[in-house]
A protein has these predicted regions:
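N-terminal soluble domains immediately following signal/targeting peptides that reside
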Residues: 18-277
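Bacterial N-terminal signal peptides that target proteins for export
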Residues: 1-7
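C-terminal motif of bacterial Sec signal peptides marking the signal peptidase cleavage site
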Residues: 13-16
Length: 277
Protein backbone atom coordinates (compact mmCIF):
# COMPACT_ATOMS: atom_id res chain seq x y z
CA UNK A 1 0.00 0.00 0.00
CA UNK A 2 1.19 3.55 -0.64
CA UNK A 3 1.73 5.76 2.42
CA UNK A 4 -1.42 7.63 3.36
CA UNK A 5 -0.99 11.28 4.19
CA UNK A 6 -2.95 13.08 6.87
CA UNK A 7 -3.40 16.79 7.36
CA UNK A 8 -2.74 17.21 11.05
CA UNK A 9 -4.61 20.14 12.49
CA UNK A 10 -2.44 22.43 14.54
CA UNK A 11 -4.93 25.19 15.37
CA UNK A 12 -6.33 23.48 18.48
CA UNK A 13 -9.17 21.89 16.55
CA UNK A 14 -8.97 18.23 17.47
CA UNK A 15 -6.84 17.17 20.41
CA UNK A 16 -6.88 14.70 23.27
CA UNK A 17 -8.14 11.43 21.78
CA UNK A 18 -9.58 13.33 18.85
CA UNK A 19 -12.02 12.63 16.08
CA UNK A 20 -11.53 11.72 12.45
CA UNK A 21 -14.58 13.68 11.31
CA UNK A 22 -14.40 16.84 9.22
CA UNK A 23 -13.72 19.72 11.62
CA UNK A 24 -16.65 21.94 12.46
CA UNK A 25 -14.68 25.17 12.84
CA UNK A 26 -12.24 27.14 10.71
CA UNK A 27 -8.66 25.96 10.99
CA UNK A 28 -5.33 27.62 10.40
CA UNK A 29 -2.05 26.02 9.36
CA UNK A 30 -1.62 22.28 8.88
CA UNK A 31 1.34 19.94 9.03
CA UNK A 32 1.53 16.63 7.27
CA UNK A 33 2.49 13.32 8.87
CA UNK A 34 2.14 9.95 7.18
CA UNK A 35 2.44 6.25 7.82
CA UNK A 36 5.62 4.68 6.49
CA UNK A 37 7.27 1.27 6.56
CA UNK A 38 3.84 -0.36 6.44
CA UNK A 39 4.28 -4.14 6.27
CA UNK A 40 1.61 -6.78 6.88
CA UNK A 41 2.97 -10.10 5.58
CA UNK A 42 -0.42 -11.81 5.70
CA UNK A 43 -3.97 -11.20 6.84
CA UNK A 44 -5.85 -14.45 7.37
CA UNK A 45 -8.78 -14.68 9.75
CA UNK A 46 -7.90 -16.53 12.93
CA UNK A 47 -4.16 -16.73 12.22
CA UNK A 48 -1.52 -14.58 13.95
CA UNK A 49 0.38 -12.02 11.91
CA UNK A 50 2.57 -9.00 12.66
CA UNK A 51 1.92 -5.44 11.54
CA UNK A 52 4.95 -3.15 11.20
CA UNK A 53 4.87 0.60 10.60
CA UNK A 54 6.34 3.94 11.58
CA UNK A 55 5.17 7.55 11.50
CA UNK A 56 7.08 9.89 9.21
CA UNK A 57 7.30 13.57 10.11
CA UNK A 58 6.84 16.38 7.57
CA UNK A 59 10.64 16.42 7.20
CA UNK A 60 10.58 12.77 6.13
CA UNK A 61 12.40 11.61 9.25
CA UNK A 62 10.76 8.97 11.43
CA UNK A 63 9.00 10.22 14.55
CA UNK A 64 10.85 8.72 17.52
CA UNK A 65 9.86 10.92 20.46
CA UNK A 66 6.48 10.06 21.98
CA UNK A 67 4.87 11.12 25.22
CA UNK A 68 5.39 8.86 28.21
CA UNK A 69 3.74 8.69 31.61
CA UNK A 70 1.18 6.84 33.68
CA UNK A 71 -1.91 8.08 31.84
CA UNK A 72 -3.43 6.89 28.56
CA UNK A 73 -2.34 9.86 26.42
CA UNK A 74 1.06 8.39 25.64
CA UNK A 75 2.77 6.62 22.75
CA UNK A 76 0.45 5.17 20.13
CA UNK A 77 -3.01 3.64 20.37
CA UNK A 78 -3.52 1.12 17.57
CA UNK A 79 -7.26 0.58 17.14
CA UNK A 80 -8.69 -1.64 14.40
CA UNK A 81 -12.43 -1.95 13.81
CA UNK A 82 -14.39 -4.09 11.37
CA UNK A 83 -16.48 -2.02 8.98
CA UNK A 84 -19.79 -3.32 10.37
CA UNK A 85 -18.58 -2.44 13.91
CA UNK A 86 -18.87 -6.09 14.90
CA UNK A 87 -15.25 -6.50 16.07
CA UNK A 88 -12.51 -4.33 17.54
CA UNK A 89 -8.80 -4.74 18.31
CA UNK A 90 -7.04 -2.31 20.67
CA UNK A 91 -3.26 -2.39 21.20
CA UNK A 92 -0.54 -0.06 22.48
CA UNK A 93 2.62 -1.03 20.58
CA UNK A 94 5.96 0.33 21.75
CA UNK A 95 8.25 2.29 19.45
CA UNK A 96 11.79 1.08 18.93
CA UNK A 97 14.69 3.54 19.05
CA UNK A 98 14.34 4.15 15.30
CA UNK A 99 10.59 4.78 15.54
CA UNK A 100 9.43 1.40 14.22
CA UNK A 101 6.37 -0.37 15.65
CA UNK A 102 5.81 -4.13 15.46
CA UNK A 103 2.49 -5.47 16.73
CA UNK A 104 1.23 -9.06 16.75
CA UNK A 105 -2.40 -9.25 15.57
CA UNK A 106 -5.08 -11.84 14.92
CA UNK A 107 -8.07 -10.74 12.87
CA UNK A 108 -11.15 -12.58 14.20
CA UNK A 109 -13.01 -12.86 10.87
CA UNK A 110 -12.72 -11.94 7.20
CA UNK A 111 -13.83 -8.43 6.34
CA UNK A 112 -12.79 -4.84 5.80
CA UNK A 113 -11.08 -3.24 8.78
CA UNK A 114 -10.29 0.41 9.44
CA UNK A 115 -6.96 0.98 11.19
CA UNK A 116 -6.57 4.02 13.45
CA UNK A 117 -3.07 4.99 14.56
CA UNK A 118 -3.73 7.52 17.33
CA UNK A 119 -0.36 9.12 18.13
CA UNK A 120 0.85 11.30 21.01
CA UNK A 121 4.13 12.94 19.97
CA UNK A 122 6.36 14.56 22.55
CA UNK A 123 6.77 17.80 20.63
CA UNK A 124 6.68 21.48 21.51
CA UNK A 125 3.77 23.55 20.29
CA UNK A 126 -0.02 23.11 20.26
CA UNK A 127 -0.10 19.66 18.62
CA UNK A 128 -1.39 17.23 21.28
CA UNK A 129 -2.16 14.19 19.18
CA UNK A 130 -3.30 13.14 15.74
CA UNK A 131 -4.69 10.13 13.90
CA UNK A 132 -3.53 8.33 10.76
CA UNK A 133 -5.66 5.77 8.94
CA UNK A 134 -5.40 2.70 6.76
CA UNK A 135 -7.75 -0.02 5.54
CA UNK A 136 -6.97 -3.73 5.72
CA UNK A 137 -9.07 -6.32 3.90
CA UNK A 138 -8.99 -9.84 5.33
CA UNK A 139 -10.05 -12.23 2.55
CA UNK A 140 -13.03 -14.53 2.85
CA UNK A 141 -16.76 -14.29 3.38
CA UNK A 142 -17.14 -11.25 5.60
CA UNK A 143 -19.92 -11.28 8.18
CA UNK A 144 -22.26 -8.33 8.21
CA UNK A 145 -24.14 -7.92 11.44
CA UNK A 146 -26.69 -5.09 11.51
CA UNK A 147 -26.17 -2.99 14.61
CA UNK A 148 -28.68 -3.84 17.32
CA UNK A 149 -30.72 -1.01 18.84
CA UNK A 150 -29.65 0.49 22.14
CA UNK A 151 -29.82 -1.94 25.03
CA UNK A 152 -29.03 -0.63 28.51
CA UNK A 153 -27.39 -3.86 29.69
CA UNK A 154 -24.68 -5.93 28.03
CA UNK A 155 -23.21 -9.08 29.62
CA UNK A 156 -19.58 -10.00 28.90
CA UNK A 157 -18.04 -13.12 30.47
CA UNK A 158 -20.63 -12.94 33.24
CA UNK A 159 -19.99 -9.26 34.00
CA UNK A 160 -23.00 -6.97 33.57
CA UNK A 161 -22.48 -3.51 32.09
CA UNK A 162 -25.55 -1.30 32.60
CA UNK A 163 -26.04 2.26 31.36
CA UNK A 164 -28.33 4.22 33.65
CA UNK A 165 -31.35 5.74 31.91
CA UNK A 166 -31.93 6.41 28.24
CA UNK A 167 -29.07 8.47 26.77
CA UNK A 168 -29.95 11.81 25.17
CA UNK A 169 -26.78 12.72 23.30
CA UNK A 170 -26.04 15.73 21.11
CA UNK A 171 -23.09 16.27 18.80
CA UNK A 172 -20.34 18.75 19.74
CA UNK A 173 -21.63 18.90 23.31
CA UNK A 174 -20.28 17.38 26.50
CA UNK A 175 -22.40 14.41 27.52
CA UNK A 176 -21.98 11.81 30.22
CA UNK A 177 -23.18 8.23 30.63
CA UNK A 178 -23.43 6.50 33.99
CA UNK A 179 -22.21 2.91 33.74
CA UNK A 180 -22.46 0.25 36.44
CA UNK A 181 -20.34 -2.90 36.16
CA UNK A 182 -21.06 -5.91 38.36
CA UNK A 183 -19.32 -9.23 38.78
CA UNK A 184 -21.07 -12.52 38.00
CA UNK A 185 -21.82 -12.64 41.75
CA UNK A 186 -23.68 -9.33 41.50
CA UNK A 187 -21.08 -7.41 43.51
CA UNK A 188 -19.47 -4.24 42.07
CA UNK A 189 -16.48 -4.92 39.87
CA UNK A 190 -13.01 -3.68 40.84
CA UNK A 191 -11.13 -1.83 38.09
CA UNK A 192 -7.38 -1.69 37.63
CA UNK A 193 -5.58 0.48 35.06
CA UNK A 194 -5.21 -0.97 31.56
CA UNK A 195 -3.20 0.98 28.99
CA UNK A 196 -3.13 3.86 31.49
CA UNK A 197 -6.88 4.13 32.17
CA UNK A 198 -9.52 2.49 34.33
CA UNK A 199 -11.80 2.49 31.28
CA UNK A 200 -11.55 3.36 27.61
CA UNK A 201 -14.66 4.64 25.81
CA UNK A 202 -14.02 4.15 22.08
CA UNK A 203 -16.60 5.48 19.64
CA UNK A 204 -17.04 4.69 15.93
CA UNK A 205 -19.81 6.11 13.75
CA UNK A 206 -21.77 3.62 11.64
CA UNK A 207 -21.03 3.94 7.92
CA UNK A 208 -18.34 6.64 7.95
CA UNK A 209 -16.35 5.02 10.81
CA UNK A 210 -15.57 8.42 12.34
CA UNK A 211 -13.66 7.94 15.59
CA UNK A 212 -13.42 9.42 19.06
CA UNK A 213 -11.92 8.12 22.29
CA UNK A 214 -12.30 9.20 25.94
CA UNK A 215 -11.04 7.76 29.22
CA UNK A 216 -11.76 7.23 32.88
CA UNK A 217 -8.58 7.44 34.95
CA UNK A 218 -7.52 6.90 38.53
CA UNK A 219 -7.44 9.91 40.82
CA UNK A 220 -4.48 12.21 40.18
CA UNK A 221 -3.59 10.49 36.89
CA UNK A 222 -2.50 13.08 34.33
CA UNK A 223 -3.06 12.99 30.57
CA UNK A 224 -6.68 11.86 30.70
CA UNK A 225 -8.63 14.79 29.23
CA UNK A 226 -9.97 14.54 25.66
CA UNK A 227 -10.54 17.68 23.61
CA UNK A 228 -12.74 18.62 20.64
CA UNK A 229 -12.31 22.23 19.58
CA UNK A 230 -12.55 24.28 22.78
CA UNK A 231 -14.45 21.56 24.68
CA UNK A 232 -12.67 19.30 27.15
CA UNK A 233 -14.04 16.16 28.75
CA UNK A 234 -12.89 13.44 31.14
CA UNK A 235 -14.68 10.53 32.76
CA UNK A 236 -14.53 9.61 36.45
CA UNK A 237 -15.11 6.66 38.75
CA UNK A 238 -17.90 7.71 41.09
CA UNK A 239 -17.88 4.68 43.40
CA UNK A 240 -16.86 1.00 43.26
CA UNK A 241 -18.11 -0.50 40.01
CA UNK A 242 -19.57 2.80 38.78
CA UNK A 243 -18.14 4.92 35.96
CA UNK A 244 -19.13 8.29 34.53
CA UNK A 245 -18.14 8.08 30.87
CA UNK A 246 -17.45 11.24 28.90
CA UNK A 247 -19.10 11.46 25.47
CA UNK A 248 -17.98 14.17 23.03
CA UNK A 249 -18.82 13.37 19.41
CA UNK A 250 -18.33 15.66 16.40
CA UNK A 251 -21.43 14.74 14.35
CA UNK A 252 -24.81 13.11 14.84
CA UNK A 253 -25.77 9.64 13.69
CA UNK A 254 -25.59 6.09 14.97
CA UNK A 255 -22.44 5.38 16.95
CA UNK A 256 -21.03 2.20 18.43
CA UNK A 257 -19.45 2.60 21.86
CA UNK A 258 -16.89 0.02 22.96
CA UNK A 259 -16.26 0.22 26.70
CA UNK A 260 -13.01 -1.52 27.57
CA UNK A 261 -11.75 -2.08 31.10
CA UNK A 262 -9.78 -4.48 33.24
CA UNK A 263 -12.05 -5.81 35.97
CA UNK A 264 -10.76 -8.29 38.53
CA UNK A 265 -7.89 -9.15 36.18
CA UNK A 266 -10.13 -9.71 33.13
CA UNK A 267 -9.93 -7.39 30.10
CA UNK A 268 -13.53 -6.88 28.97
CA UNK A 269 -15.11 -5.16 25.97
CA UNK A 270 -18.77 -4.16 26.19
CA UNK A 271 -20.43 -2.73 23.02
CA UNK A 272 -23.40 -0.36 23.01
CA UNK A 273 -25.30 1.34 20.18
CA UNK A 274 -25.95 5.05 20.69
CA UNK A 275 -28.05 7.55 18.76
CA UNK A 276 -26.57 11.05 18.63
CA UNK A 277 -28.56 14.08 17.42
Amino acid sequence: MKPAALAVLVAVVLAGCGSSSPPQITIGAARTYQLGGWVLPSATAGKPTTLSFRIDQPSGAALTNYRTGAGPHTGVHLIIVRSDLGAIIHKHPKASADGEFHQALTFPTPGRYRVVVDAYPNLSGPLRNFQLFRVITVPGAAPHQPLPPFKPTVTVSGYRFTIGGRPHLRAVQSNFLTLHVTRPSGQPATFTPWFGALAHAIFFRAGSLDYFHTHVCSARTTGCTSVLGATRIMGTQTRPGALRLGVLLPVGGTWRLFVQCKADGHVLTAPFTLDVR
